[in-house]
Amino acid sequence: MFFKRSITVMLLFFLLGAASPLLAQEAETPSQAQDEIDSILYGEAGVGGVIQRLGKVESDLFGRELPGSISERQLGLLNFIRNGTLGQPSMVFKTGVAEWAVLHEVRSDMPLNRRISEIERQLEGAAGEDRPLAMRLERILSLLITGQVTWQDVRVPANMVFRASFIDRISPKSAAAGDVVRLKMEDHLSIEGYLVAPRGSRIIARVDKVKPPRSFGRPSEISFVFDRLEPLGPEEIPVFLGDAAVLASKSDKTVAAAAGTSALGFILLGPIGLAGGFLVKGDAQEIPPGSVIYLETSALSNVKGYPVPPSLKGLLESSEYNVSEDSEGTETDTNQEGGVQSEQD
């Protein structure tokens, strides 16, 4: 009975989402749209024709293929999986809430099917891979949370400071301008009881410039520009490395201590709004994964947040460095790009 009721409700939201084209941005071609759907769900584009791949996704999610044109079905899937529909949070949002409740962090770099399987293994010892994926997620949520998972509009102010760490290993020898650099949140970001971005939420930066070693023994350099934080919802939060973040780095004893080691240090490069960042020195030839940096939001952002119920409030309070609206930094000029520069001896 639970299975049939859950599938019926999910199919209703799916069909309503397909009729609401403003909730998603369509890709240029059916193949591109399908690649995007496959990547979110499986981590890579599928093989075969679009119709075959589309049918597989629907069967994996709902246990059956759905009616409608290719574009309607793909739009409905993108809304159901990533964007949400008519007040109903997306699968990505719900999965993040479940991960936060069980693991106290999200695993944004894993495909959705693996994320759900890992939660099942944590709770029940095995993944229920013989059942439709959407139903499996709803069952997980019914075990963790009383009532339905909802989301609300939340305003994230500019200049909120938070800790992040590098996921990727960065070396001036191998980096090239334009390379994507991944970081993750080290703490939960919440606004007045609404969970916006749990620990583990992904942050995207890019390599801006790379300079090879120069004359007179001057070291090679690599600089980064920070782009965005990807919260629970489908929106993006712009971030940068500004004065408030640099001040927080200096005030953090752990991070400040790293500045005195041979592995990692901080340098400041200019006035407010310009780059501050890392200096790789001594025997170190790279920025290793796990290197901590403070960043801050660069503009006011409207995003979706999870209204944390009283039974789960302790998960927010248990985070030693939980970020809240009270940690909003001072006003700074965010019209200039903030970045990180690394130098290699």
Q: What are these regions, as identified by a protein language model?
A:
Residues M1-M10:
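Bacterial N-terminal signal peptides that target proteins for export
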Residues R5-S6, Q88, T330-T332:
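A detector of low-complexity, intrinsically disordered, Ser/Thr/Gly/Pro/Ala-rich segments
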Residues V9-A18:
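Bacterial N-terminal signal peptides
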Residues S20-A24:
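Sec/Tat signal peptide C-region and signal peptidase I cleavage site
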Residues Q25-I145:
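Alpha-helical, heptad-rich or low-complexity scaffold/stalk segments
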Residues T150-L268, G273-D345:
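Contiguous beta-sheet cores, especially beta-hairpins with glycine/small-residue-rich turns
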